[in-house]
Regions:
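Conserved functional micro-motifs across diverse proteins
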Residues: 23-199
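C-terminal motif of bacterial Sec signal peptides marking the signal peptidase cleavage site
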Residues: 18-21
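Bacterial N-terminal signal peptides that target proteins for export
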Residues: 1-10
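Hydrophobic helical h-region of N-terminal Sec-dependent signal peptides
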Residues: 10-16
Length: 199
């Protein structure tokens, strides 16, 4: 039988408290950056701009997809976060989508070849608004995951990530000064099914 004295228990508790305090550098001039979830100003805009879902068939997740709408409101938050993290203006990071409707889409699928959104023989990508559906003018694979996963929580080593741009004006779908909420829908479809993401 093990006997614990109050002194031993107090020493053990104190050692745990001291050890848990060493989770970041104590050196002067060194600081860690907030992750996406800790940057409350950015995270709120990110959450409002991001939609996602799973395409499930016969109890199997075939695709897990998320899209972040590069609305003017979110784009401003992205630029501010980039200035905090990288101490530079990355306003031109997604220059292709600066005045157009653009999305960052992350997709995971069991087969690597099946998640190539730029392959129009396998995927149909549409932007639906009150003017009707349009196909993208740009589907560009993002390769710099190390940089962009600091901005998009759904990016991982297992996802394929794309910048998708449509020839439509970008709007803030939740802006309070709008008389009528604009229809903003991204549709991703292939032979297995489709997913519609609404803002």
């Amino acid at each position: 039988m093990i006997k614990f004295s109050m002194a031993k228990l107090a020493m053990f508790t104190l050692s745990l408290q001291l050890a848990s305090g060493c989770v970041s550098s104590m050196d002067r001039g060194i600081s860690t950056s907030d992750d996406i979830y800790s940057d409350s100003e950015y995270y709120e805009k990110y959450e409002n701009a991001t939609r996602g879902g799973d395409l499930i068939k016969k109890f199997e997740i075939l695709y897990r997809m998320h899209a972040t709408y590069l609305s003017p409101e979110f784009s401003n938050a992205l630029v501010k976060r980039a200035q905090k993290l990288y101490l530079e203006d990355t306003g031109g990071a997604f220059q292709e989508a600066s005045s157009k409707a653009g999305f960052i889409v992350t997709i995971y699928g069991l087969e690597r070849e099946s998640v190539d959104l730029s392959n129009t023989a396998h995927w149909t990508v549409l932007f639906e608004s009150k003017e009707g559906p349009v196909k993208p003018i740009l589907v560009k694979k993002l390769n710099d995951k190390i940089r962009w996963r600091n901005f998009f929580a759904t990016m991982s080593p297992w996802t394929s990530d794309y910048l998708i741009v449509f020839d439509r004006a970008a709007v803030n779908p939740s802006a309070s000064n709008l008389v009528e909420k604009p229809k903003t829908r991204l549709v991703l479809a292939n032979g297995d099914g489709k997913i519609q993401l609404d803002w």
